[in-house]
């Protein structure tokens, strides 16, 4: 059986989803699947996150499903109980990291510096979220951080879109790229899930070239 990280590397992209309504969760997941992407990260930026994760887990069992913007141990517990298979956080919170590792939940903590990479390595973590990627200097900064830490893989997120995705995916130390360009909030709000499918297909065309 492959690990979560191996599965993410095969997918190459992680749609970062913020849902305002639980009823949008399953149609959105199905739109991504139709577009060829069987992975998504539901953020805890809204109160319906855990319920949305549970709905997707029940109706779309083959989706690789993560919980994002996990800031507290309580949210990590809610994510796991709802069926999330991995956790992503914007920063490095040692309590959240320790909880996830202690309960067998893969976690991708956010880092923005060499110091935070070293903290991750102290916990035995070698896959980190480079966030916010573009504001921190993009692939140039990521390359600079990668050089001293040869075992670390990155999930760059923040400011990535169709026009710069190829540059990130081509980077040898990138495991997968996270972003919301495939799942625009206005399309979800309007129930225009066909747009999500179209953007997913465009994304895979770019990833497939690499």
UniProtKB/Swiss-Prot annotation:
Its principal location?
A: cytoplasm
Question: Which compartments does it reside in?
Answer: Cytoplasm
Kindly state which reaction or reactions the protein catalyses. 2-dehydro-3-deoxy-6-phospho-D-gluconate = D-glyceraldehyde 3-phosphate + pyruvate
Q: Name one Pfam family in it.
A: Aldolase
State where pyruvate binds.
Answer: 45, 69, 129
Q: Kindly list the residues the record flags as site (Plays a major role in determining the stereoselectivity).
A: 157
Q: Name one GO cellular component term.
A: cytoplasm
Q: What does this protein do?
A: Catalyzes the reversible, stereospecific retro-aldol cleavage of 2-keto-3-deoxy-6-phosphogluconate (KDPG) to pyruvate and D-glyceraldehyde-3-phosphate.
Q: How does it assemble?
A: Homotrimer.
Write the protein's name: 2-dehydro-3-deoxy-phosphogluconate aldolase
Organism, as annotated: Treponema pallidum (strain Nichols)
């Amino acid at each position: 059986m492959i690990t979560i990280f191996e599965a993410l590397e095969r997918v190459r992209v992680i749609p970062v989803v913020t849902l305002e309504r639980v009823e949008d969760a399953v149609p959105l997941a199905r739109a991504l699947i139709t577009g060829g992407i069987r992975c998504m990260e539901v953020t805890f930026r809204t109160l319906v996150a855990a319920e949305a994760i549970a709905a997707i887990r029940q109706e779309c069992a083959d989706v690789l499903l993560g919980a994002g913007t996990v800031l507290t141990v309580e949210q990590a517990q809610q994510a796991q109980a709802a069926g999330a298979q991995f956790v992503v956080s914007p920063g490095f919170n040692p309590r959240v990291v320790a909880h996830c590792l202690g309960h067998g939940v893969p976690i991708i903590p956010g880092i923005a510096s060499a110091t935070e990479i070293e903290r991750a390595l102290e916990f035995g973590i070698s896959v980190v979220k480079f966030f916010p990627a573009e504001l921190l200097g993009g692939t140039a900064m990521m390359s600079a951080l990668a050089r001293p830490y040869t075992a670390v893989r990155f999930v760059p997120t923040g400011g990535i879109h169709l026009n710069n995705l190829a540059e990130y995916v081509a980077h040898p130390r990138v495991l997968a790229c996270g972003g919301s360009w495939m799942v625009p909030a206005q399309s979800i709000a309007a129930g225009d899930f066909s747009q999500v499918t179209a953007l997913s297909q465009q994304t895979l065309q770019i990833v497939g070239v690499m």
